[in-house]
Amino acid sequence: MVSRRVQALLEQLRAQGIQDEQVLNALAAVPREKFVDEAFEQKAWDNIALPIGQGQTISQPYMVARMTELLELTPQSRVLEIGTGSGYQTAILAHLVQHVCSVERIKGLQWQARRRLKNLDLHNVSTRHGDGWQGWQARAPFDAIIVTAAPPEIPTALMTQLDEGGILVLPVGEEHQYLKRVRRRGGEFIIDTVEAVRFVPLVKGELA
């Protein structure tokens, strides 16, 4: 039984065009308040982005749902997330597929996310401290790659780590950003522009 606040958010997401009920069920199952600081717990189920420290944010539920829906996941999908952040998007993915790989460049955020996921008994996630621009070559290829920060252009390494038929969803741009979906098909990459967005930048390198 979902709470009134959760139900209200789900209805809002449906009104915004989210149609995949499995994605909506995953959002309902993951307690977003566990991924934000106590000061923001009362706003956890509002459809807004919230700060998580280190200059990073937890994306608004609409954007989490939209990007996840665009990945066209099945339980068997091999998924890579670039930018673990709070671990919220990771948890949504973990409810939808058998295993998630996630890369985070800020070690403090990586450890916090791992603790949150463990506390929620989500053990089907592998996290790595590293440069998201480089993906996770040792675990490639992937059926789906999601990037939760915006590079100025699509990283080549991520495109090459897509399997045939795989989908990459990411925001791209600097001052003006657009959500892009890249599909690998027959050795080519088909790129679609979805909508205008605003994300923190995807920074190269890693932080201790």
Curated annotation (Swiss-Prot):
UniProt-annotated catalytic positions: 59
Subcellular location: Cytoplasm
Domain of life, source organism: Bacteria
GO molecular function, one term: protein-L-isoaspartate (D-aspartate) O-methyltransferase activity
Keyword DNA-binding: no
Enzyme Commission number, as recorded: 2.1.1.77
Signal peptide: none
Primary location recorded for the protein, binned into one broad class: cytoplasm
Gene Ontology CC terms: cytoplasm
Reaction equations catalysed: [protein]-L-isoaspartate + S-adenosyl-L-methionine = [protein]-L-isoaspartate alpha-methyl ester + S-adenosyl-L-homocysteine
InterPro entries the record matches: PCMT, SAM-dependent_MTases_sf
CDD domains: AdoMet_MTases (cd02440)
Keyword Ligase part of the UniProt annotation: no
Keywords: Cytoplasm, Methyltransferase, S-adenosyl-L-methionine, Transferase
Gene Ontology BP annotations: methylation; protein modification process; protein repair
Free-text function comment from the UniProt entry: Catalyzes the methyl esterification of L-isoaspartyl residues in peptides and proteins that result from spontaneous decomposition of normal L-aspartyl and L-asparaginyl residues. It plays a role in the repair and/or degradation of damaged proteins.
NCBIfam families membership: pimt (TIGR00080), PRK00312.1 (NF001453)
Annotated family: Belongs to the methyltransferase superfamily. L-isoaspartyl/D-aspartyl protein methyltransferase family.
Protein name in UniProt: Protein-L-isoaspartate O-methyltransferase
Upper classification of the organism: Bacteria, Pseudomonadati, Pseudomonadota, Gammaproteobacteria, Enterobacterales
